[in-house]
Curated annotation (Swiss-Prot):
GO biological process, one term: non-canonical Wnt signaling pathway
Name the record gives this protein: Secreted frizzled-related protein 1
Disulfide topology: C58-C121, C68-C114, C105-C140, C129-C166, C133-C157, C186-C256, C189-C258, C203-C306
Organism: Gallus gallus
Organism lineage string: Eukaryota, Metazoa, Chordata, Craniata, Vertebrata
Subcellular location: Secreted
Length: 314
């Protein structure tokens, strides 16, 4: 991704989170003052609190938990704050958020998500601040809508605390938590030519096609892509007999640039998902067999190591 944050930037942001959290905990007393028989929440998101059937434990964040491995701390609590009791379940659920993290829609995205998926080890659960949730939601939901998704119910911001002990990056009005500037590229077109990133998109998409494009036009705020030739790499919900009639939409993309579409004389790798009767483009790459990273992807495409993505966005 051309505008992706560096790992150092993410770690710096996470350090700010931990410092803010430390100050907050000092304000209400040391962790040893809390007497919890089991891992219980009383912070409002889950009225009446909750108990887990298993005692909580502090475990290392594994390298293949890609959403949170670079968050800035090394250990997390299981069960987490989304009721995932095993690491396998955490990885399964968290994997669907990695493409959004790579879109860099807000610098607090990783901190917010990992405070829930991979909470830092403390004597009691601490949730993200409501304003952090709102800031991430307001910046990232417009990006999600390009892919046909909306902010999910499981992350409704009004369930998180406003002014109690909570995870924060800095003050709500700080300029550094605003959405990074400098890109107006349609999010599905803002892709890094790295084999791992292409595989992530393939796994997160319902279908994938090699195609040439006949025409691109604007209609009702979308870019409409009319294929000339197409070959299915992954059909998903598309029936083979319907391939000839397939039309793709770059949702909300009428007025944002998609540089891959500036020259239609190439073959393209196009991925997407079906929403009702529409087929939305979720990623586009020039089909470039001379590119080293694309060649790596082609070796992996026959048997990609894909998790089964949960329907967390519905």
């Amino acid at each position: 991704m051309g505008v992706g944050r560096s790992e150092g930037g993410r770690r710096g942001a996470a350090l700010g989170v931990l410092l803010a959290l430390g100050v907050a905990l000092l304000a209400v007393g040391s962790a040893s003052e809390y007497d919890y028989v089991s891992y219980q929440s009383d912070l409002g998101p889950y009225p009446g609190g909750r108990f887990y059937t298993k005692p909580h434990q502090c475990v290392a964040i594994p390298a293949d938990l890609r959403l949170c491995h670079s968050v800035g701390y090394d250990k997390m609590v299981l069960p987490n704050l989304l009721d995932h009791e095993t690491m396998a379940e955490v990885k399964h659920q968290a994997s669907s958020w990695v493409p959004l993290l790579n879109k860099n829609c807000h610098m607090g995205t990783q901190v917010f998500l990992c405070s829930l998926f991979a909470p830092v080890c403390l004597d009691r659960p601490v949730y993200p601040c409501r304003w952090l949730c709102e800031a991430v939601r307001d910046s990232c939901e417009p990006v999600m809508q390009f892919f046909g998704f909306f902010w999910p119910e499981m992350l409704k911001c009004d369930q998180f605390p406003q002014d109690y002990v909570c995870i924060a990056m800095t003050t709500p009005n700080a300029t550094e938590v605003s959405r990074p500037k400098g890109t107006t590229v349609c999010p599905p077109c803002d892709n890094e030519m790295k084999s791992e990133a292409i595989v992530e998109h393939l796994c997160a998409s319902e279908f994938a096609l090699k195609m040439t494009i006949k025409e691109v036009k604007k209609e009702n705020g979308d870019k409409v892509i009319i294929p000339r030739k197409r070959k299915a790499l992954k059909l998903g919900p598309i029936r083979k007999k319907n391939l000839k009639k397939l039309v793709l939409l770059l949702k909300n993309g009428a007025d944002c640039p998609c540089h891959q579409l500036d020259n239609l004389g190439h073959h393209f790798l196009i991925m997407g998902r079906q929403v009702k009767t529409q087929h939305l483009l979720t990623a586009i790459y020039k089909w470039d067999k001379k590119n080293k990273e694309f060649k790596k992807f082609m070796k992996k495409v026959k048997a990609p190591d894909c998790p089964t993505f949960p329907s967390v966005f519905k």
